Amino acid sequence: QTAAQRGVKLAVFPEFCLTGYTCGDLFLQRTLQQGALDALEWLLAQTRTLDTVALVGLPLLVHGKLYNCAAVLCRGQLLGIVPKTYLPNYGEFYEKRQFTPGSTEVQTVTVCGQQVPFGTSLLFRCRQMPSFVLGVELCEDLWSALPPSTFHALAGATVIANLSASDETVGKAE
């Protein structure tokens, strides 16, 4: 609400901001997954009258597979869900243990009672600002040889949002 009051049109929150990044195997627990959906539903209700596009990170179970996702929402509506493509599995990162990589194939899924597109190749266009075309990727996606953002830009994206988070380990900054 504060962002909308200040005229912010796009608010990008961190990867897994609805649960925290360091949940590890707790991501596999139905209670945590439902808690993330409950938080998303609450956000949808709180943003019904707001003219800000918000991107929030959450784990999402789709057809029996768990994904690390960005939910794109505005005015109480889910505009789409973008799953992470490249899952890190080195050092302190073990995402392949819990998550499935996203696909460019777009499918329709039901989230919080809304039918929404789900896929890594989604672009979000603003009717009031035709030159504003949003592409979304998550953290490690950016560091791949061919990041989703490259394909988003080639498809017409003028803004790329990257939801990122990381855990903290002793000596990481060294």
Set out the residue ranges of the language-model regions.
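Enzyme catalytic cores with a strong preference for nitrogen-chemistry domains
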Residues: 1-174
